[in-house]
Amino acid sequence: MISEPFLKASPILTTLISNGYEGYFVGGCVRDLLLQKDIHDIDIATSATPNEVMHLFKKVIPVGIEHGTVIVRHGGESYEVTTYRQDGEYTDHRRPNDVRFVTNLAEDLRRRDFTINALAMDTSGQITDLFHGQDDLKKKLIRTVGNAEERFTEDALRILRAVRFSSQLGCTIQEDTLEAMFVIRKQIQHLAVERITIELTKLFQGQHVSKAIQYIIDLQLDEQLPIFQSGKSDIFKAMKENITPLHSFSEVIAVFHLLDPTIKIHDWIKNYKCSNHVKNDTIQLINAYHYYQSHGINNWLLYILPTKLWDGFIRLIYVIDRTTIERKQLEEITATLPIDKRSQLHLDGNDLMNWFPHRPKGKWIKILLEEVEYLVVSKQLPNEKKIIKEWVLCNQPDPN
């Protein structure tokens, strides 16, 4: 029996079929169903052309109509509906120069990357498996559909996808597929870096990331990646033995940087075209690590480290130092903090200006606020304005 996500999407297939077209669930959603994993995105393949799909459904978004894909909105969800197709020649290492729509499911499945993704399922749960993908799933084997070198030449990202699937699913990559990955590996350098970043993020999240890293080393894939092209491949070798799944690319960059501090954080961010969000989280993780190295876990560390980064920090310490930190320890310390943020401090810039009316504004205000903030957080000074004022007046700041 098919699961709830497929039942929700079934009316789309029913509409296609009742109007004389074919319609199937395809790809990763079918694979994940067989593996009893959570279903995220459901993709649909059909014999209907994009124009015919748009005619059948009221809410559609023609996101990739030139390649046969439209998004159908149904039940508050978005579903990619793609016309059966054959791909033309690939010259940009990503997309075919042209596509030819076909009416045969077999032709559509034949163009897909791996056998475990070349699966289709109808609304009754009947699976179409032309390339023994179910057998490969049982064997935990990653194998290309058809000629491996052709598949990787069409889109070199498939090389990284194969390694990513080994990390996520614990699969072994079939020998012929491995050989083709090695032969075509240099084409990875032609890929858009944003696509590489997405694959690496997913790869490092996998439960079998150590296995994936070994593939990267053995196939010399690291030498094709930004920054690593300059001979920094020892980073992967250094991280392999103690790696654990890393849940964000910020954690990945933090590990890379701490294993080789000669490469600046800015260079990682720039070369992998990361967002400011990733940049800020990376910097906070690295700063927290360095503080931890000097002071251990204390009030100030938990004050400056956002709760959302705790788990990433714990993973970082484990990978770099082989030290296990319990989240409960962080929770217990945080529960005793006198303040959670600076706005709770019983001192502000106006207080300091009032207490030192003859001093011009300057850096001394910021420095003094930070010093008092640290003393209060570390419980060396009560968060009481009267006592804080006495301390400030007894420790007059440098006016410069």
Curated annotation (Swiss-Prot):
UniProt keyword annotation of DNA-binding present: no
Organism domain of life: Bacteria
UniProt: ATP binding residues: G28, R31, R112, D155, R158, R161, R164
Cofactor annotation: Mg(2+)
GO function terms (MF aspect): ATP binding; CCA tRNA nucleotidyltransferase activity; magnesium ion binding; tRNA binding
A Pfam family this chain is assigned to: PolyA_pol
EC number: 2.7.7.72
Keyword Transferase among UniProt keywords: yes
Protein family (similarity comment): Belongs to the tRNA nucleotidyltransferase/poly(A) polymerase family. Bacterial CCA-adding enzyme type 3 subfamily.
Record text on subunit structure and interactions: Homodimer.
PANTHER family recorded: CCA TRNA NUCLEOTIDYLTRANSFERASE 1, MITOCHONDRIAL
UniProt-listed NCBIfam families: PRK13299.1
Protein name as it appears in the record: CCA-adding enzyme
Organism whose genome encodes this protein: Oceanobacillus iheyensis (strain DSM 14371 / CIP 107618 / JCM 11309 / KCTC 3954 / HTE831)
Gene: cca
